[in-house]
Design a protein with these regions (language model features):
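Extracytoplasmic/secretory soluble proteins
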Residues: 4, 8-9, 13, 17, ...
Length: 629
């Protein structure tokens, strides 16, 4: 029988619980208090231990640079050398199965697999001695939730990362998700409003009519994406679901109600993506404005087209085009940006109780010979003093406390920081050589820069302010947005347009706290994924609504026959059990921090008739009936 397992995390958020079976404990070969099994060899460089780390190469590029001052400082504080490697998903799976792992390893979304292989060290007996920062301050909430959702016998296996607010409601750049357009062409059309998907398609068609080729002669295409997962449609107001939940079970970001994205197309970002891509295909097939290479091109080929401006719309903002153009035209508006509108949701004010869980976490290998050093690394990554230095430079070099105990940048540090934020690439610039929070790999550090520091200020007291964002806004498109919409910051334009953000969403925290599905259930979901993948191209290239609907109905019939709805009913019960605890905690923290959750009256127009009519008590009692598509 599966037990809920928990993970505690640092100053601002909480912990992730996962199922831990008796079989997993036996496979791990250890119980609380036992020493981890030793590896046959030990990595040592000279007088220093070599601490090995494996990250996933699917994480926003290889951002680790051991020559940066921040990483040298970390190694210096630990007294180790760091060997940081990126591995492919295939290698990751193979090494999990074999147990041949480095000291510290990244997670993927399915934490239960790691537990079942028994490759993660139960660090609970060692936290007080080697990683006390995870047990202090706001992180205590995490530990308390662990005690509430887990039980005394459960271990602690995973370290959540980037605990705190993902976005703070103001920024000098806009959200990367929504209706993304080539801004220069969009302005040329007079900034037409985009209130729904059909408006978006109309704008893209007008752009293509005006610009069938780029200035350099490359053909343009209506829309580009590097995946068909629903990363675009999830953020549209008519869906309003959390993209990051495991499987195709996504929650509404306002109510946190969970939906079956396999057999309920009305609440599925994947089915919505298929419908959207089919619209694009039928609109662009005659004149070649639908890019058929989307099915076969590599990510490098896709990025090259983005950098040349060949796509008129994108699934997410990409900076390559703007960066290319600004080199030769300091006033350029050529680049991609999201249109301010109430028709999409703004990914900000997201209080991540469990950080970027469950997909972005770490564990220490059960076979690591260097558990003390690994735990000490996490202790620093949960230390608000250390994370402040990672973010703003070493105390005494770029900043210090004044006579009243207020942290302030010194003249040199402020000068260097301002130049860096303005885009300096001078190797002599302090922050170019030191690094910065936004240059770290996407699952470091464990606290966000907007986390509270014990001194009463944010960890990043220097730049996470509205005033600093205004003063350092240098992007031409951002400035154009402010001028056109009559606002101070681009994010203001979204709220002015009636846009809403993710402040109510608890999806990632809930998913991290759930006990896992069993092997039979996971096997059904694996087959369900294969059924949908098999239909993907046929759905996108369907010539008529009738053909598209026939494919949809047949695939849903296959999914029902497979037994996927029964798996969803089990998952929904687990979800609701975790949500009952997590949602009130997140709301409490949001209110305490001055971010008032949206009321049902405020988000009523973002719920379909089925959503707003459903009574909460019906959520657990639903049978295997599948909603009509």
């Amino acid at each position: 029988m599966k037990r809920i397992l928990s993970f505690v995390i640092s100053a601002f958020m909480i912990l992730a619980l996962l199922p831990c079976s008796a079989a997993a404990e036996q496979a791990a070969g250890q119980t609380a208090g036992e020493q981890p099994a030793e590896q046959p060899t030990e990595a040592v460089a000279g007088d220093r231990v070599v601490l090995t780390i494996a990250d996933m190469n699917t994480r926003s590029g290889n951002r680790y640079n051991g020559e940066m001052g921040m990483w040298r400082y970390l190694a210096e504080r630990l007294g180790v050398e760091i060997q940081y490697d990126y591995i492919s998903p295939q290698e990751y799976s193979a090494r999990l199965a074999s147990g041949d792992l480095p000291d510290i390893v990244a997670t993927d979304k399915n934490l239960s697999t790691i537990l079942e292989y028994g490759v993660a060290l139960n660090v609970d007996p060692y936290l007080e001695e080697y990683c006390p920062n995870i047990l202090k301050g706001d992180a205590r909430l995490t530990y308390d939730v662990f005690k509430q959702l887990g039980n005394e016998g459960d271990g602690f296996y995973f370290f959540p990362v980037k605990i705190g607010y993902n976005g703070v409601g103001y920024d000098n750049e806009t959200t990367a998700r929504g209706y993304v357009v080539r801004w220069d062409y969009y302005k040329e059309l007079g900034y037409p409003p985009i209130n729904n998907e059909d408006d978006f398609l109309s704008v893209l068609l007008q752009m293509h009519k005006n610009h069938p080729v780029t200035e350099e002669g490359y053909p343009t295409y209506l829309y580009g994406t590097d995946n068909f997962s629903g990363y675009d449609t999830a953020f549209r107001a008519e869906l309003s679901v959390d993209y990051w939940a495991p499987y195709k079970y996504q929650n509404n970001i306002f109510t946190n109600e969970i939906f079956d994205g396999y057999t309920d197309p009305a609440h599925s970002m994947w089915w919505a993506s298929m419908e959207w891509e089919n619209k694009l295909y039928r609109a662009g097939k005659a004149d070649g404005s639908y890019d058929m290479d989307l099915f076969t091109q590599t990510i490098e080929q896709f990025d090259a087209k983005v950098a040349r401006g060949q796509y008129l719309g994108l699934h997410a903002e990409k900076s390559g085009l703007y960066k290319n153009k600004i080199k030769t035209d300091p006033n350029t508006l050529t680049g991609y940006n999201t249109v301010p509108t109430s028709a999409t949701n703004f990914y900000t004010n997201v209080y991540q109780l469990l950080g970027n869980g469950p997909g972005y976490m770490w564990f220490i290998s059960a076979n690591s010979q260097h558990k003390e050093e690994a735990l000490s690394l996490f202790n620093l990554m949960y230390d608000p003093d250390f994370v402040r230095e990672l973010t703003l430079g070493r105390r005494g070099e770029t900043w210090d406390y004044d006579a009243e105990g207020v942290p302030r940048m010194n003249e040199y540090g402020q000068e260097q920081l301002d130049a860096y934020k303005a885009g300096s690439t001078d190797p002599d610039n302090y922050f170019v050589s030191w690094g910065s929070f936004d240059k770290m790999p996407s699952n470091w550090p464990c606290l966000r820069d907007n986390s509270p520091h014990p001194d009463g200020y944010m960890v990043d007291f220097a730049t996470v302010t509205r005033e600093y964002e205004k003063a350092t806004m240098s992007n031409n498109i951002s400035k154009d947005i402010c001028e056109h919409y009559g606002v101070e910051l681009p994010t203001d334009a979204f709220y002015k347009a009636g846009g809403m953000d993710f402040r109510n969403d608890c999806g990632e925290a809930i998913a991290s706290c759930m006990s896992s599905l069993n092997r039979d259930q996971l096997n059904i979901l694996s087959k369900a994924e294969a059924i949908l993948l098999d239909a993907q191209v046929d759905l996108i290239l369907a010539e008529t609504d009738e053909e598209w609907e026939a494919i949809r109905d047949e695939k849903i019939r296959q999914l029902v026959e497979l037994g996927e709805p029964e798996v969803f009913n089990v998952y929904r019960k687990k979800w609701n059990d975790a949500a009952e605890i997590i949602v009130p905690l997140v709301r409490e923290v949001q209110v305490r921090n001055g971010v008032t959750p949206y009321t049902p009256e405020q988000y009523a127009d973002r719920l379909g008739p089925e959503d707003s009519a459903q009574e909460p008590e019906d959520q657990n009692s639903a049978g295997t009936e599948v909603q009509e598509p």
